[in-house]
Amino acid sequence: MKRRWSLITAIAVLTVALAFVVVQLVRGQGAGDQPAAAKPVASAPGTDPGALRGVAWWPLHQSGTAKAGERDAEALGRTQWVDGPTGGALQLDGLSGYAETGTRLDTKGQDYSVAARVRLTADDMNGFHTALSQDGDQISAFFLQYSGQDQNFAFSFSGARTVAEKTEKPQAGRWYHLTGTYSQKDHRMQLYVDGRLAGSRIATSSVDPTGEVVLGRAKFNGETVDFWQGDIADVHLYDRELTPREVESLSAREPD
């Protein structure tokens, strides 16, 4: 009887062991398989390099070729190509040099943002120098500029100016990253310097954007004014208001 029970016990143990081996083999066959794919999670704002290209992007690395958008920038007046912070830049003389983009933003009906890397020379830190603007009939729809009156960077409309109040005064010969954003819903214009919010105010512009975005000058009373004296690189245009995180990301690194 004892032998019989010993035999039954041995068979039971072998059965359990065999079942365990079979389970492990089944699992092993699927070890290299991936689990059922979940829906991809969208990148958080500021982490998707493609989204930061914008509707237009001109690196200005020895040419006006666009990396986003359909139109290249055309340099006019006294300009030359120089080294820049990320590969090259367009140098403007402060008298006649600027660049046309052939591109428009809907600054009256849509949120928008503009950004550029800029460097001023030491020749004139008391005047107005505009890095980016968009022509209206008589005056620019916006100005991303240096204000000699305030001795600092500014994002401006006709009759309204957001000055960089949270940063030190700009130094000639140093590169800065400037971003101007506008929300139609909140009527909020904001200026960022090197990825950080530097100024904000509530304002509206009555100027219709009848012309193109221009690099290196502005328009006032029907005349071209405020020519940039220094260098400009990596110009971006957006048909939306960038988030603070996106601005910080763009300032730190250009998209691929």
PLM regions: where:
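Surface-exposed loops/turns
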Residues: 108-109, 171-172, 209
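Short tryptophan-centered beta-strand motifs in secreted/extracellular beta-sheet-rich domains
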Residues: 173-182, 191
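Short, aromatic/His-centered strand-loop micro-motif at the edge of beta-sheets
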Residues: 102, 153-177, 222
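A general beta-strand register signal
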Residues: 91, 156-158, 192
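Extracytoplasmic low-complexity segments
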Residues: 2-96, 185, 199, 248-256
